[in-house]
């Protein structure tokens, strides 16, 4: 099993030339950062599109959120949103090139992106075998609700969540020290931004992967 993340930037045609260059540079930066921390392969295409393949699928969900929150918060002068579709399943990477690779995970990821609303993220479970019940309806509801929460973050809130997830969910006191504030303040800000929802969602999706 592999995981394939396909996505594109939201409303990139409305960006100025300078903002578009910043967005693409930022997208490449965060993907290189993710590649440095995982065993993924990525490719940029269609001007504002991207695809990432994770041979180790348990790395995929956290990377998906890391990418999203980086674009929301770490590009100077502009907050960029993206639409994402992450699918699990069989697949074969062709010469380290996601764009020319094939398999269930690639097909399902592409289809899910085509059916996603702008700014939404979707996760597609691998085909269920051995008579087990698919959890896809529950996953769809959770993705819809969490997309709603994340799409309403301010740039400051997204920045805090980016710090939280990119540092592998450190203790709140660590973030407090880094931001020169109190632990209580960080805890309240994380909760109001939906930070307490990320790790349970990641763990849930990875548990389903192990059951497929």
What is each stretch, according to the model?
Residues 1-212:
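Regulatory and interdomain segments flanking nucleotide-handling catalytic cores
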């Amino acid at each position: 099993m592999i995981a394939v993340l396909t996505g594109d930037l939201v409303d990139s045609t409305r960006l100025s030339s300078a903002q578009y260059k910043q967005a693409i540079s930022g997208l490449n930066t965060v993907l290189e950062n993710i590649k440095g921390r995982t065993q993924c392969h990525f490719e940029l295409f269609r001007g504002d599109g991207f695809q990432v393949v994770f041979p180790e699928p348990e790395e995929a969900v956290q990377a998906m959120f890391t990418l999203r929150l980086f674009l929301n918060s770490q590009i100077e002068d502009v907050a960029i949103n993206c639409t994402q579709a992450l699918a699990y399943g069989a697949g074969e990477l062709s010469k380290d090139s996601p764009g020319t690779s094939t398999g269930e995970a690639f097909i399902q990821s592409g289809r899910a992106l085509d059916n996603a609303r702008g700014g939404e993220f979707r996760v597609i479970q691998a085909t269920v075998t051995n008579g087990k019940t698919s959890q896809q309806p529950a996953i769809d509801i959770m993705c819809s609700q969490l997309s709603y929460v994340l799409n309403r973050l301010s740039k400051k809130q997204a920045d805090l969540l980016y710090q939280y997830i990119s540092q592998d969910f450190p203790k709140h006191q660590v973030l407090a020290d880094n931001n020169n504030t109190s632990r209580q303040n960080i805890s309240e800000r994380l909760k109001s931004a939906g930070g307490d929802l990320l790790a349970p969602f990641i763990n849930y999706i990875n548990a389903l992967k192990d059951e497929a």
